[in-house]
Every structure is written in C-alpha cells, then in structure tokens.
C-alpha cells in the first residue's frame, strides 16, 4: 500500500504541494497577525532633508529685502584673485 501511495504522491506532486503550501501560508499569515495584534498607529512622516533645506531657504528669502543689492559698478572683482592668478606668480 505504501509504495502505491508514494508513487501517487510523486506523480501528482504539483497538485499536492500547492494546496499544502497554500494552507501553511494562510495559517502563518493569520498567526502572525494574531501575535502582532492591532495595526500600529501611523507615524507622522518627517520632512526629508531636501524639504527642510527648501523651507529654511524660503524663510531666509522672506526675511531679506531684495531691492537692496550691490550694483555691478560697486563690485570690484567678478572672480576671486586666487582663481585667476594661481599660475601667474608675478601678479601675486
């Protein structure tokens, strides 16, 4: 009798294993939710670093008066000396 049983199980293995795996998975799923309990309260998401940076920059912009800027005539240099005169020792 056992050899016939094992031959049938081996022949129809896909048809046997799927329902068994389904039952084991369903029991495990419900057991996990039973052990875990109720759903935890959703945690309020924190702002990302880039969002906090944007908010900070906007706050800084709101505090400034954008009509008071230096004219181009008042600016003596457009680039720092160190960049333009790096390879010219006679100008240092």
Curated annotation (Swiss-Prot):
Keywords: Membrane, Transmembrane, Transmembrane helix. PANTHER family: SMALL INTEGRAL MEMBRANE PROTEIN 12 (PTHR28599:SF2). This is Small integral membrane protein 12. The keyword Aminoacyl-tRNA synthetase does not apply. Its main location: membrane. InterPro entries: UPF0767. It is found in: Membrane. It comes from Myotis lucifugus. Belongs to the SMIM12 family. It is a single-pass membrane protein. GO terms for cellular component: membrane. The gene is SMIM12. The chain crosses the membrane at residues 15-34.
């Amino acid at each position: 009798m056992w050899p016939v049983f094992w031959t049938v199980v081996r022949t129809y293995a896909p048809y046997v294993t799927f329902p068994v795996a389904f039952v084991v998975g369903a029991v495990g799923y419900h057991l996990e939710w039973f052990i875990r309990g109720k759903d935890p309260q959703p945690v309020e998401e924190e702002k990302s670093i880039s969002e906090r940076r944007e908010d900070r920059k906007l706050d800084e912009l709101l505090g400034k008066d954008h009509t008071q800027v230096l004219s181009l005539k008042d600016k003596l240099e457009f680039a720092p000396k160190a960049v333009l005169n790096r390879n010219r020792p006679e100008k240092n």
